[in-house]
Amino acid sequence: VSPPGGSRPLFHHCCLFALAAPPDAALLAELERFSAAFRAAFPAIRRYRFGANLSRKAGRFGLVLYSAFDDEASFRAYVASALHDEVAAFLAPLVTETMIGDIEA
């Protein structure tokens, strides 16, 4: 599938997190702080957003991370970063299960 107008496809990364407790305003605010730091540190990030899962089929997966990168190499650099390690360590005690999907579109 090609993007509209023949532009280059982006690399999209989506994480669904099951949490021990539903995401509250304090958690979402802290995750927005991380989001802003990622956007500032990585110019190849086109979108980066945590949010409560609004799907009626969310089930136990109450938190979503949606991100889009210029390409897969940019995504790999993000995953290898100390900032990624920091957010992963922050979320680790809160998360009971994670599902991840990546596509280029």
Question: What is the meaning of each model-derived region?
Answer:
Residues 79, 88-91:
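Short, flexible helix/strand-to-coil boundary loops that buttress conserved ligand/catalytic motifs
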Residues 1-62, 70-80, 96, 103-105:
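Short S/T/G/P-rich N-terminal loop/turn motif that feeds into the first structured element of a domain
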Residues 91-98:
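Short glycine/proline-enriched turn or capping motifs at secondary-structure junctions
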